[in-house]
Amino acid sequence: MQFIEIVEKLKKGQSGVVDFKIKNNPVILTAASLENAKDNDISFLDNNSPLNLRNLIETSKASALLLPANDTYIIEIAKKISVDWIILKEPKIAFAETLEFLYPSNVESEGIHKSAVIGQNVKIGLGVSIGANAYIGDNTEIGAGTIIHAGVVLYRNVRIGSKNLIHANSVIHSGSKLGDKCVINANAVIGGEGFGFVPTSNGWKKMPQVGIVILKNKVEVGSGSTIDRPSVGETIIGEDTKIDNLVQIGHGVTTGKGCAMAAQVGIAGGAQIGDGVILAGQVGISNRVKIGDGVIASSKTGIVSNIEAGTVVSGFPAIPNKLWLRCSANFKKLPEIAKAIRQLDRKKSR
């Protein structure tokens, strides 16, 4: 792809092209970091990049650069170098869009592989691809343009919207509903049984889990993640929510739109998550907790009670992040503080 083609495509995107220079109009074949780029590569510098990366634009071997509009230092250097460039309001978004141009998703050929098993009364939309050894249960519906890779299992009565991408060996249980443009990565399980057992004098009594899971439009679920169905009712994942690998979402959880959850997050049953909530790696949330819109929880935070909207929390149990930082700074001083207190006690007892 020639550089001018990338320029024209980015003009139509979301990155905000401010200016560009086309001198050599190189053919761009791949993308790379500034330090590793070579001929026919395109690279980028993000807003607020550290000085050591900013200085690399003078020595990088990339054939083209995506540069931030808010950095006057970079813009001055760009005017002096011979490399073609684009100046943008959001260079990271531009780089993401450029990767999409250069590395289009591998699209399976339309149609149903001969080894796939298709149940009764299954409705399959136009342009659907179903890979080898996939299993589609009775009364399931699959929307137009959806791609189902090898080994996927859709139980009966599943509803899949249009343009979804379901990767190999994922399992979607009975009654689950996916909106449009969802991505389910390999080995994820949607709608598995919630963890429901009742203690009795004779041991544990299993609580049947007959509810369903609903994923709204543009939800992405990482490899090995699980979203459980409840005993009754629904587990709901809001539109445009992004879930990393190895995340566990319990029965009856609801999330708002635009949430993000990093690896090994665990959310217990019945928790209610607002819009735009960000959960860093290994965050744990107790059952039935309510978390307001825009909450951010740093890594390993343990949330055991409700959190107000817009709060940034850390630690276990979760406390405001600034307080946690102060506590953490003092933690290593505790031996000295304890020693001082003992000395005061001895003086007092004399």
UniProtKB/Swiss-Prot annotation:
GO terms for cellular component: carboxysome; membrane. Transmembrane segments: none annotated. It catalyses: a UDP-3-O-[(3R)-3-hydroxyacyl]-alpha-D-glucosamine + a (3R)-hydroxyacyl-[ACP] = a UDP-2-N,3-O-bis[(3R)-3-hydroxyacyl]-alpha-D-glucosamine + holo-[ACP] + H(+). InterPro entries: Hexapep (IPR001451), Hexapep_transf_CS (IPR018357), LpxD (IPR007691), Trimer_LpxA-like_sf (IPR011004), UDP_GlcNAc_AcTrfase_non-rep (IPR020573). Pathway: Bacterial outer membrane biogenesis; LPS lipid A biosynthesis. It comes from the Bacteria. GO terms for biological process: lipid A biosynthetic process. It holds the Pfam family LpxD. The active site is at residue 251. Its EC number is 2.3.1.191. Keywords: Acyltransferase, Lipid A biosynthesis, Lipid biosynthesis, Lipid metabolism, Repeat, Transferase. GO terms for molecular function: N-acyltransferase activity; structural constituent of carboxysome shell. It is an enzyme of class 2 (transferase). Homotrimer. Belongs to the transferase hexapeptide repeat family. LpxD subfamily. Catalyzes the N-acylation of UDP-3-O-acylglucosamine using 3-hydroxyacyl-ACP as the acyl donor. Is involved in the biosynthesis of lipid A, a phosphorylated glycolipid that anchors the lipopolysaccharide to the outer membrane of the cell. This is UDP-3-O-acylglucosamine N-acyltransferase. It comes from Prochlorococcus marinus (strain NATL2A). The lineage of its organism: Bacteria, Bacillati, Cyanobacteriota, Cyanophyceae, Synechococcales. The gene is lpxD.
